[in-house]
Design a protein with these regions (language model features):
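Catalytic histidine-centered segment of alpha/beta-hydrolase-like enzymes
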Residues: 263-272
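Flexible "cap/lid" loop of the alpha/beta hydrolase fold
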Residues: 148-155, 164-191
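Active-site loop/oxyanion-hole signature of alpha/beta-hydrolase fold enzymes
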Residues: 101-138
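Short beta-strand/loop motif that positions the catalytic acidic residue
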Residues: 222, 228-230, 234
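Conserved HGGG/HGGXW glycine-rich cap/lid loop of the alpha/beta-hydrolase fold
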Residues: 63-108
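Conserved loop-alpha-helix segment in the C-terminal half of the alpha/beta-hydrolase fold
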Residues: 91, 232-256
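An N-terminal hydrophobic leader/cap segment in hydrolases
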Residues: 10-50
Length: 290
């Protein structure tokens, strides 16, 4: 009996300790001070900024000249603005663009821990875009779940954006894996066991599986150039999403598709040169517009 009692207490202490540990780690973010030091080592000045909307703080980082067109990056799940730190330090890109990367709602330093639906994320992120409006073209780039976020932004505010680049984006509701286990960790006390950023990540993925069906009806409004870049060996987001996107955008003559043979889900980092090359072509697009 004593052993059983000690075992139960030990198990309880373990779970309490795990819950405390889980909420304090794996947040997938760095402090502004750490990031500032990294930029300064490269001789770059980064600005760390916050927009407040209805009691929610949205954190984002900006590099480059405010007189230039904007590359606006939206990260996947989990993640934070620094997923695109390398691009924000790139001297070739900075010759042509101001670069902004945002902590999506629920991640980084943007109301960390609370998941938001797709439409709510678009409304909040657009507040950053409005604040940073410099009357120059804005190009949206989204990776993974950042893909449907930028599609939602473009559907809601079609006149605001010059182009979309969808990197391994999960936009097809019919190609989403069922993953019923996620619902257990969203709608039961087991959610307390999810560490750090994995909790809002799991919650928003559950939301997005339904939200994508609403997104499905708004593609007719997208007339701007749209580029899909995807690996055909992506195990997280199937390359079938590209075919879905093409089928929804048959009215748009400005669709470009780059399928990378053998590439996984992590193309922003593993195929940096290819993606940077694509982004540099957007500068030529801006010149033609002027």
């Amino acid at each position: 009996m004593k052993f059983k009692k000690k075992f139960k207490w030990g198990l309880l202490i373990f779970f309490i300790s795990w819950i405390i540990f889980a909420q304090s780690c794996m947040k997938f973010r760095i402090t502004d001070g750490q990031a500032k030091a990294e930029f300064e080592q490269r001789g770059l000045h980064a600005r760390f900024l916050t927009v407040k909307e209805e009691g929610i703080s949205l954190h984002y980082v900006k590099t480059g000249s405010d007189s230039l067109p904007t590359l606006f990056f939206v990260h996947g799940s989990p993640g934070s603005w620094d997923a695109f730190k390398g691009y924000m330090m790139d001297s070739a890109l900075l010759q042509h663009f101001r670069i902004i990367s945002v902590d999506r709602p629920g991640f980084g330093y943007s109301d960390f821990g609370t998941a938001y639906h797709l439409t709510d994320q678009a409304v909040l992120i657009n507040k950053v875009i409005q604040k940073e409006d410099n009357q120059k073209p804005v190009h949206l780039i989204g990776h993974s779940i950042g893909g449907p976020v930028i599609v939602q932004l473009a559907q809601d505010y079609p006149a605001e954006f010059a182009s979309l680049t969808i990197l391994a984006g999960s936009i097809s509701p019919k190609d989403e894996p069922k993953e019923y286990w996620r619902y257990v960790f969203t709608y039961s006390p087991l959610k307390l066991l999810m560490p750090g950023a994995f909790k809002p990540s799991n919650d928003e993925i559950v939301y997005f599986k339904k939200d994508l069906y609403s997104l499905d009806t708004g593609y007719a409004d997208l007339q701007m150039p749209i580029t899909f870049i995807h690996g055909d060996a992506d195990k997280f987001v199937t390359v079938k999403n590209v075919e879905y996107g093409k089928s929804k955008l048959q009215h748009n003559p400005h669709i470009k598709v780059i399928i990378i043979p053998g590439a996984s889900h992590f193309i922003p980092w593993q195929y940096y040169s290819l993606i940077r090359g694509h982004l540099l072509t957007l500068s030529a697009m801006d010149s033609e517009r002027n």
